[in-house]
A protein has these predicted regions:
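Extracellular loop-to-transmembrane helix junctions
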Residues: 1-11, 37, 89-90
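Hydrophobic alpha-helical membrane-insertion segments
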Residues: 2-6, 40-61, 123-136, 215-226
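Short helix-coil transition sites and intra-membrane helix breaks within transmembrane domains
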Residues: 5, 16-18, 48-54, 181-188
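Hydrophobic/aromatic residues in alpha-helical transmembrane segments
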Residues: 11, 56, 109, 190-191
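Membrane-interface helix-loop junction between the first two transmembrane segments
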Residues: 11-21, 202
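Inter-helical loop and helix-membrane interface segments of multi-pass membrane transporters/permeases
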Residues: 21-40, 53-112, 139-175
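Membrane-embedded translocation segments of transport machinery
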Residues: 118-231
Length: 231
């Protein structure tokens, strides 16, 4: 995040601000022969959307379930399995999710994405904080009778385990971290180039990128604190 992430994110936003265009147009303006790079970066979010639509459909389904007062039914062990194995329900909710997403994107960055994000992101952040705190209060007893608490899970989450670390495993961890970096910061996907085209010339890019990285890392940490202690 502090090295590759900062450099790549700054580059993407700077390209967008300089050219005032989306990925395909930006690369073409810098050099016509580079237009294919813009096309490749455009294809990345298209591919990502293929499974985002599925996961978004799951979230939409559970949102409807909870809003209609069926939370207890959704907590059953076989509820999720029966939903995803249905021949119609996952498709319907994925289409609903895609329809809402398409409507927001159709309205553009400022009138669509920005307006929705201004209220959606704070709500999601508050929910993540609440669930993270709740995860710390959980505890369960395993088959041997030993009690495991959320605090123990949180400490496990924070404690590095260097046992059995080899060069090969270290390189794999590094590769995984790089993959997470590209995905989390949305670099080299054309997304930040498009956002960069809306950045005003007087904005300090170094400061803006630092803020993005701090917020991104903070949310990632909270996501881990939300999931791992509960596991």
């Amino acid at each position: 995040v502090l090295t590759f992430g900062f450099t790549l994110l700054t580059s993407d936003i700077a390209i967008g601000r300089r050219t005032q265009k989306s990925a395909i147009g930006a690369y073409a303006e810098m050099k016509p022969k580079w237009k294919f790079l813009g096309i490749l970066t455009f294809l990345v979010p298209v591919l990502i959307m293929t499974y985002y639509a599925v996961i978004g459909g799951w979230i939409t389904k559970y949102a409807v379930v909870y809003l209609t007062g069926q939370a207890k039914a959704a907590a059953a062990d076989d509820y999720f399995t029966s939903f995803i194995t249905s021949s119609t329900s996952p498709v319907i909710f994925a289409l609903i999710f895609m329809g809402v997403t398409a409507f927001i994107v159709y309205n553009g960055v400022q009138d669509g994405i920005e307006k929705v994000s201004k209220w959606m992101m704070p709500v999601l952040l508050v929910l993540v904080v609440i669930i993270s705190i709740y995860s710390l209060t959980l505890k369960h007893t395993d088959s041997s009778g030993q009690v495991h608490t959320g605090i123990q899970g949180f400490l496990y989450y924070l404690t590095p385990n260097l046992e059995g670390l080899t060069v090969q495993r270290f390189l794999q961890i590094l590769l995984d971290a790089m993959s997470q970096l590209f995905f989390s910061l949305s670099v080299s996907m054309g997304i930040m180039i498009t956002y960069g085209s809306y950045v005003k010339p007087d904005v300090d890019l170094n400061k803006a990128v630092n803020q993005i990285e701090i917020f991104d890392t903070g949310v990632a940490f909270l996501a881990g604190a939300m999931i791992i202690p509960a596991a």
